[in-house]
């Protein structure tokens, strides 16, 4: 008669340990690398994957991508939000029993939780929030509505900025509040007023760092002294050097978690003298021209406001040449007649032409949306605002400058049904271009911050005891 075999205590203990290990390994919190591969809607064919350069030549800090730069397995229909998991040994553990976690580790663990929440939202096609949501993104205007919504929830819940306090007005801590560069000053003022929920109490709590220096104000001050813009370059670099020498944060990341904002045409030139030093630095720019060094995976395209339509730039000159006051259906004015109301004209129009001027951006994009007019983007090399999450092809029309002579034929070829669909979607996305003070969820200031938030989630800081 066979005897009853009883497992030894050693084997039971070993089995329990193995089961515990498997539970920890497959936990969503351990899978902390969410890589957001951007392929912005641009008037040029761009489909880059995010691979951040390593360090600046002036520091030794190692800034890593949040996951392997290899092409990730995509869980989505469109590329901007895709997930990849790299070697588990490179993951940042969410609990350490051996030693006390550094503040940098705590920050990175916080971002890991955000990535896990976004991953779950994509997988479950739902969102998780601890507060009532005032708006639920949905529909094809978003590259992935679930990813965007959960990402915005995580940003509101977690994202903290440190605004450097060094420097004095008028070049620092303020910017233009009206006219063509107004978004620059409005954003700086929102961050400077001190009541934004995104502001960190201490710099060591911050996920990202804002340099509140205004390129427009620098130009205003120094252009009168020397009507040439290169003297402004060392002013910006000097400011960065001041905060880099006073705090450890720039050198820790080689500038990868730092950003500036500017709507001035000359803003892209501030890094020209030392591209290596600024190669990781996030620039939030209206002049988002990929042919002039704008990198969609690193930089952020900023919507421009408040346009007056004088002829400047080759594209507008070409537009005036072919269509200026030549057709009742294609109304193109260099200077609007006194009896005409600009915003009324936009509101009465089906399609609003948004040509580039001397630089690629056009404020008419925003104005068209306010009037529920379908924007017609006429530009080369322009990375459109918020194209990390918005699919511009679903609510705008794109016409390359070389086809301006065919403008009427192209627009006439759009059926009434297609036009009404585009217009309905314009109304849906218009909320993302509204400027509110104080900022509100999903408005333009939140969208700018969300663009920075995405880029911050795509890097991993070195684990030093800062």
Language-model regions: role of each:
Residues 2-263, 267-332, 336, 427, ...:
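Juxtamembrane luminal stem/stalk of type II transmembrane Golgi/ER carbohydrate-processing enzymes
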Residues 341-434:
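Catalytic binding pocket for nucleotide-activated donors in carbohydrate/polymer assembly enzymes
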């Amino acid at each position: 008669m066979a005897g009853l075999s009883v497992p030894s205590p050693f084997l039971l203990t070993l089995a329990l340990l193995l089961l515990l290990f498997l539970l920890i390994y497959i936990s969503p919190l351990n899978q902390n690398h969410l890589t957001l591969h951007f392929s912005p809607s641009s008037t040029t064919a761009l489909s880059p994957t995010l691979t951040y350069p390593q360090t600046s030549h002036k520091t030794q800090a190692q800034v890593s991508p949040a996951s392997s730069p290899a092409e990730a397995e995509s869980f989505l229909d469109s590329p901007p939000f895709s997930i990849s998991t790299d070697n588990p040994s490179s993951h940042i553990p969410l609990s350490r029993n051996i030693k006390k976690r550094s503040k940098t580790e705590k920050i990175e663990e916080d971002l890991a939780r955000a990535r896990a929440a976004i991953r779950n939202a994509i997988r479950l096609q739902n969102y998780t929030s601890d507060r009532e949501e005032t708006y639920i993104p949905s529909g094809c205007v978003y590259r992935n509505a679930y990813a965007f919504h959960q990402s915005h929830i995580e940003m509101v819940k977690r994202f903290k900025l440190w605004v450097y306090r060094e420097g004095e007005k008028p070049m620092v801590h303020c910017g233009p509040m009206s006219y063509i560069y107004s978004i620059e000053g409005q954003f700086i003022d929102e961050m400077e007023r001190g009541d934004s929920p995104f502001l960190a109490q201490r710099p060591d709590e911050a996920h990202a760092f804002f340099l509140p220096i205004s390129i427009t104000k620098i130009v205003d001050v120094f252009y009168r002294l020397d009507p040439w813009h290169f003297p402004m370059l060392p002013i910006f670099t000097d400011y960065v050097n001041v905060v880099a020498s006073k705090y450890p944060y720039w050198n820790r990341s080689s500038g990868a978690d730092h950003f500036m904002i500017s709507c001035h045409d000359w803003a892209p030139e501030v890094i020209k003298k030392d591209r290596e030093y600024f190669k990781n630095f996030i620039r939030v720019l209206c002049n988002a021209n990929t042919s002039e060094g704008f990198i969609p995976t690193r930089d952020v395209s900023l919507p421009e406001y408040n346009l007056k339509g004088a002829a400047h730039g080759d594209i507008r000159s070409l537009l005036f040449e072919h269509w200026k006051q030549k057709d009742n259906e294609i109304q193109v004015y260099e200077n609007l007649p006194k009896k005409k109301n600009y915003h009324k004209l936009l509101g009465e129009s089906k399609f609003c032409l948004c040509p580039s001027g001397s630089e690629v951006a056009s404020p008419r994009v925003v104005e068209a949306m306010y009037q529920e007019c379908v924007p017609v983007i006429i530009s080369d090399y322009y990375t459109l605002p918020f194209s990390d999450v918005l699919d511009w092809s679903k609510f705008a029309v794109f016409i390359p400058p070389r086809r301006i002579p065919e403008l009427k034929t192209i627009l006439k070829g759009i059926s009434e049904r297609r036009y009404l669909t585009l217009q309905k979607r314009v109304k849906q996305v218009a909320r993302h271009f509204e400027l509110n003070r104080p900022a509100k969820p999903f408005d333009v200031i939140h969208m700018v911050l969300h663009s920075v938030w995405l880029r911050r989630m795509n890097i991993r800081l070195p684990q030093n005891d800062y």
